[in-house]
């Protein structure tokens, strides 16, 4: 449990993977591409920079606003502007980075006012009651496509990315 509040990304990754393994998603989700096709968003925000997600949203002309203190990139705003901007958010996507740096905790009141909040995995334990209580409506997680645990392990251990590999499918689960 102490690793879940670790400032080190490696320790947080281990702890979140363990928590997710102890409380896995038990329901079938909607494929991410199908879920994104149904988004009707004028104001979409991402808390924490997740490059593949930003690229995917831009490709779909969703034009997200990204709030992140770690990334100095065009189109990325500092997180301190979040409370001023998020009041009119249609969709709020929260990355694991926002969990690790505890930025999500400072946004709890705003999350409860936003009707569509997605917590982005991997490594999110399936605790629907807890997640709903803090204002989360959806959890997006990668799921291994095949029963090839060894292949998945080797791919991730070699530094592979779970975003763009045929071993994974992204699913969105409604709470």
PLM regions: where:
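Short, polar loop motifs at secondary-structure junctions
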Residues: 49-52, 66-72, 122-126
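C-terminal functional extensions of proteins
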Residues: 118-175
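Structural motif
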Residues: 45, 91-95, 118
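A short acidic, amphipathic alpha-helical/loop segment
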Residues: 56, 103-110, 130
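A short helix->loop->beta-strand "cap" motif at the edges of active sites that frequently abuts
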Residues: 61-62, 111-116, 136
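Histidine/lysine/aspartate-rich catalytic loop segments that bind and position anionic ligands
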Residues: 56-85, 89-90
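Electropositive, gly/pro-rich neighborhoods at or near active sites that engage anionic ligands
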Residues: 1-51, 56-58, 154, 170-175
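Active-site glycine-rich loop that binds ribose-phosphate moieties when present
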Residues: 28-32, 71-81, 99-101
């Amino acid at each position: 449990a102490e690793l879940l509040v670790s400032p080190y990304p490696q320790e947080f990754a281990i702890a979140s993977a363990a928590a997710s393994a102890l409380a896995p998603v038990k329901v079938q989700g909607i494929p991410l591409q199908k879920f994104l096709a149904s988004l009707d968003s004028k104001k979409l925000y991402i808390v924490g920079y997740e490059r593949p997600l930003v690229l995917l949203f831009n490709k779909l002309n969703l034009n997200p606003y990204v709030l992140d203190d770690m990334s100095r990139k065009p189109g990325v705003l500092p997180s301190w502007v979040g409370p001023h901007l998020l009041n009119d958010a249609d969709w709020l996507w929260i990355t694991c980075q926002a969990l690790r740096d505890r930025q999500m905790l400072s946004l709890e009141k705003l999350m409860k006012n936003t009707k569509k909040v997605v917590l982005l995995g991997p490594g999110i334990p399936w605790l629907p009651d807890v997640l709903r209580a803090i204002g989360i409506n959806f959890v997006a997680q990668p799921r291994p496509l095949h029963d090839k645990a060894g292949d998945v392990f080797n791919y991730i251990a070699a530094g592979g990315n779970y975003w763009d590999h045929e071993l994974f499918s992204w699913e969105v689960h409604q709470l």
